[in-house]
């Protein structure tokens, strides 16, 4: 309760570094959670431009990705999700910025956990022995906790007043709809696509 959460893990190499053609970086997903009443801010993002789940959706639909999302078996940029799933070589988010962020997350996780780097995980027969970091900051232990909560609320309200690009689709913060999703899942079960 009332804690900031920062969690991440490294993975097997599955992305080329910016400027490279073969996988040397991990997808290294990170989750950030900031308390906000019953609806916390939740950011859950991997370092690849498209999650592997989203690539599966595009593959099944037969639609091309909106932008090049990774490399095919000929080491060429592609919008074909099936080709990226075959090579496991997605582009990093933000191109060179995501490449750097992936590297930093890997090295920090390995250092703090005393574990393997992405390179070392990739040398194993299975994706095991990952380095993971779990940081929890109890806001109740801070002297200015009321001001922190007020700042979070004011920032989120300000963000939501941004003029939407698409009329009828208001701007919302990450995690805003999770309470609705959870409630629906509790009532109707978790949807599973066959």
Where are each of the predicted segments found?
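Conserved thiamine diphosphate
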Residues: 1, 5-22
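Short beta-strand segments
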Residues: 6-9, 33-35, 43-46, 136, ...
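Phosphate/diphosphate-binding glycine-rich loops and adjacent basic-rich segments that engage nucleotide
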Residues: 15-82
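General structural feature for long, well-ordered alpha-helical segments within catalytic domains
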Residues: 28, 89, 100, 108, ...
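Secondary-shell segments that build the walls of catalytic and ion/ligand-binding clefts
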Residues: 60-120
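Catalytic-core signal marking the mid-to-C-terminal active-site face
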Residues: 117-194
């Amino acid at each position: 309760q009332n804690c900031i959460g920062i969690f991440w893990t490294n993975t097997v190499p599955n992305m080329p570094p910016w400027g490279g053609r073969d996988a040397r970086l991990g997808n290294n997903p990170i989750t950030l959670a900031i308390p906000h009443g019953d609806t916390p801010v939740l950011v859950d993002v991997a370092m690849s431009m498209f999650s592997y789940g989203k690539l599966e959706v595009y593959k099944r639909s037969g639609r091309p990705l909106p932008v090049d999302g990774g490399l095919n078996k000929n080491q060429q940029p592609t919008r074909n999700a099936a080709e990226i799933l075959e090579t496991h070589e997605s582009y990093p988010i933000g191109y060179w910025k995501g490449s750097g962020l992936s590297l930093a997350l890997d090295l920090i996780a390995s250092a703090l956990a005393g574990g393997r780097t992405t390179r070392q995980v990739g040398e194993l027969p299975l994706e095991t022995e990952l380095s993971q970091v779990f940081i929890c900051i109890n806001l109740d232990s801070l002297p200015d906790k009321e001001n922190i909560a007020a700042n979070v609320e004011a920032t989120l309200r300000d963000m939501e007043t941004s003029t939407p690009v698409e009329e009828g689709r208001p701007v919302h913060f990450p995690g805003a709809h999770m309470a609705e999703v959870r409630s629906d899942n509790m009532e109707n079960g978790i949807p599973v696509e066959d």
